Curated annotation (Swiss-Prot):
GO terms for biological process: lipid transport. It holds the Pfam family Tryp_alpha_amyl. The lineage of its organism: Eukaryota, Viridiplantae, Streptophyta, Embryophyta, Tracheophyta. The keyword Zinc does not apply. InterPro entries: Bifun_inhib/LTP/seed_sf (IPR036312), Bifunc_inhib/LTP/seed_store (IPR016140), Plant_nsLTP (IPR000528). CDD domains: nsLTP1 (cd01960). The keyword Transport applies. Keywords: Lipid-binding, Signal, Transport. This is Non-specific lipid-transfer protein. GO terms for molecular function: lipid binding. It comes from Striga hermonthica (Purple witchweed). Plant non-specific lipid-transfer proteins transfer phospholipids as well as galactolipids across membranes. May play a role in wax or cutin deposition in the cell walls of expanding epidermal cells and certain secretory tissues.
Length: 118
C-alpha cells in the first residue's frame, strides 16, 4: 500500500478525492457535492508543509491512472468547493506535469522551497 508519509495513507487520500474525477476529466461542469465534501476533511488534515507535500504526492500518483484528468479542471476545484489555502497543490501546481520534488513546496500560506528548486 502506498503511504503518504504524512497525516493520512494514500488510500484514504485517494478515496476522499475520488468523487472529483468526473469534474477533473471534464465530464461534469462543476465539482460534485461529494467531491467537495471529500476534499474538505482532507484539507483540514493539512497542518504542515510536509502534510501538504504528502497529500499532493498521493494525488499526483493517483491521477496517473486517469489519462483524461486535466490540470485546468483540477485548478478550478478549490473555488466552488470553498477550499482556501489548505490544498495548495490544486491552487498552484500542475499535478500532471510537476516533478514530485516540486509538489507542495511553494504554496499558499506555507514556506517557499528552501532550495528554490521549483
Amino acid at each position: 500500500a502506498r503511504v503518504s508519509n504524512g497525516a493520512l495513507p494514500c488510500g484514504t487520500v485517494d478515496m476522499k478525492a475520488a468523487s472529483c474525477i468526473s469534474f477533473a476529466t471534464g465530464k461534469d461542469k462543476k465539482p460534485s457535492a461529494a467531491c467537495c465534501s471529500g476534499l474538505h476533511p482532507l484539507a483540514q488534515t493539512v497542518k504542515t508543509v510536509e502534510d501538504n507535500k504528502a497529500i499532493c504526492r498521493c494525488l499526483k500518483t493517483a491521477i496517473k491512472n486517469f489519462s483524461r484528468v486535466q490540470d485546468r479542471f483540477l485548478g478550478q476545484i478549490p473555488t466552488p468547493c470553498k477550499i482556501k489555502g489548505r490544498l495548495p497543490c490544486f491552487h498552484k501546481h500542475r499535478l500532471r506535469k510537476a516533478p514530485l520534488r516540486c509538489i507542495g513546496l511553494e504554496t499558499d500560506g506555507f514556506e517557499s522551497s528552501p532550495l528554490g528548486m521549483c
